[in-house]
């Protein structure tokens, strides 16, 4: 499992008990240090945290995830990073967004790459403000196993 833009690793650590391995990637080094300390404190040996930009680090990760969790900054995912992330072809992606316009922009690319929105939910993490977190579950469309072809002869 990948937790990209993992911050201090909260989501990775919540998912660790049901995953063989969770790899978190975060650009803020102090957050990665905290994530490693938190995982060690909680005895979560299956968590690995990497400090670096997702755009660059993703090329160096040899593991293949079975699910990807995305929690990017307000500006969303770098346009060059998104195709790299989607190239893993995982069955499910969970995208957590704090800015609806960035989410909408990224969803166009994600859907063009064969994913569909299964569920979406807004979570009011900031009461009395206009800001909400949006959580979206995306599933990769699978071919139905056959192709219908209509041929007309004139």
Q: Where are each of the predicted segments found?
A:
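Rossmann-like S-adenosyl-L-methionine
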Residues: 1-154
């Amino acid at each position: 499992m990948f937790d990209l833009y993992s911050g201090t690793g909260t989501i990775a650590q919540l998912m660790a008990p049901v995953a063989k391995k969770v790899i978190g990637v975060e650009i803020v080094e102090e957050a990665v240090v905290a994530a490693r300390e938190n995982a060690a404190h909680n005895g979560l040996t299956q968590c690995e945290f990497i400090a670096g930009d997702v755009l660059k680090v993703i090329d160096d990760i040899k593991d293949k995830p079975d699910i990807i969790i995305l929690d990017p900054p307000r500006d969303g995912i770098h346009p060059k990073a998104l195709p790299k992330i989607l190239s893993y072809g995982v069955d499910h992606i969970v995208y957590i967004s704090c800015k609806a316009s960035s989410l909408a922009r990224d969803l166009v690319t994600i859907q063009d790459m064969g994913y569909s929105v299964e569920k979406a939910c807004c979570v009011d993490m900031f009461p009395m403000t206009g800001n909400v977190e949006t959580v979206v579950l995306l599933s990769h469309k699978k071919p139905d196993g056959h192709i219908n072809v209509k041929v007309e002869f004139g």
